[in-house]
Amino acid sequence: MRIDLRLILSFCMAAIINVFAIASHADETCNSPYMSGLIKGQEDFVHVWTLGVPGMGDGSDKLVTIDANPASKTYGKVIHKISVGGRGEAHHMGFTDDRKYLWAGGLDDSTIYVFDVGSNPSHPKLIRRIDTLSAKTGYVGPHTFYALPGRMLIGSLSNAANKGGITGMSVYNNKGDFVAKYDMPTSTIKQVKGDGYGYDIAVNPAKNALLTSSFTGWNNYMRDLGEVVKDPEAMKLFGNTMVMWNLKTMQPEQILAVPGAPLEIRWALPEGQNWAITATALTSQLWLVKRDARGIWQAKDVAAIGDPTKIPLPVDISITSDAKGLWVNTFMDGTTHYFDLSNPEHPRETYSKHTGSQVNMVSQSWDGHRVYLTSSLLSRWDKQGKDDEQFLRAFQWDGHELTPAFEIDFSKEQLGRPHHMKFTANPSRLASLTGTSLH
């Protein structure tokens, strides 16, 4: 692979600088540490990247904006929607480092959309389409959009050659120009062989660490879930590794064996707590990634999620800003779980609530008082009939109970299947809240 020296140097400088002065984390605790504009108080808007459904409204993927401020007259209502003019399996999105733009991708058509959410977050504008991913990289299915200084790091799920799970990461600048690509390793590193699969991305600048996880390719995620689970060969085509990369050089340094499709990655955010946690979809386990006494990264399963024998299918997770708690959604049984992470070596489930017939994404406010859930996983994996609920549900959390705040029925409102959420605040209020560093 050809390495761009200028890119490496920029990564080096960014990483070195941010070890000493890390930019603020934003509202949802899964966002990049390089993002500016921390919302410490009440978020004003929730943006939902939504899958289009044939015959429902205009049938297009769209960005839906909901008023989330209880002081507003339109609290809990859809106040804006912008369609992209087609269906490409809308899935995830991420802010640029300046928090002014949202990049959102389609897992099927690999189109990337850039929305201006900084000028007027109540009415985002679609300003750019990027359709060069497959041609420039050979990857398809852009999943994770992770801000770096002046750059967007994109983790993909599949490849254009055979639509399998071998894939990689790509880097674009904030203007939408392609910069570089990095294949997921398939070689053996430190006695563990890579499977080449990809999914999530998460960075710990203080440890010069970039951690990736693994899922499955287009052939599986665009196929009916019932068919996949009944096909023994298809079930072999899920990721079983995580990769620790050197953030400065963007080279893989260690492969961790984590069987069962490790999905979302969440680093502990308080200074000095240099560990990460993930959940495996197929085996329903929480896994801790942490250095041992020798300074070598290790991954170990530390807790079961629900009853693994019933395959509840853990999907999204959200860590609290103090790293003492973790929300976990299990899709098949529609349950939202809360784990006490006071001892990350031994997480304890202390609360659970049935929140829908199916539930997928979870986002929480920085103070942990508000929790938002959406229902859709993938268009071909969602349930059918009466169990095909499509919603955003907002809750208040007092440390003991989730209390409903408001709900949007996306089917009734002819919007589609809601997936990923991001928060914004009005520019005037956001400006007064910036400048606060996590560390």
Model regions and ranges:
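Short loop/turn segments immediately following beta-strands, especially the blade-tip
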Residues: I66-K73, V114-P124, V171, K175-D177, ...
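Blade-loop segments of beta-propeller domains
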Residues: Y75-T144
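Short, conserved, GDST-rich strand-edge loop motifs in beta-rich repeat architectures
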Residues: G41, H47-D58, G155-I166, S213-L237, ...
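A short beta-strand motif characteristic of beta-propeller blades
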Residues: V78-V84, I127-A135, F178-Q191, Q251-L256, ...
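Beta-propeller domains
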Residues: T96, Q191-F339
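Asp-box/WD-like beta-propeller blade repeats and closely related beta-sheet repeat scaffolds
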Residues: G118-P205
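Loop/turn-rich, solvent-exposed surfaces of beta-rich toroidal or solenoidal domains
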Residues: T309-L392
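Beta-rich, blade/repeat-based domains predominating
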Residues: T29-G37, D58, G85-D97, A135-G150, ...
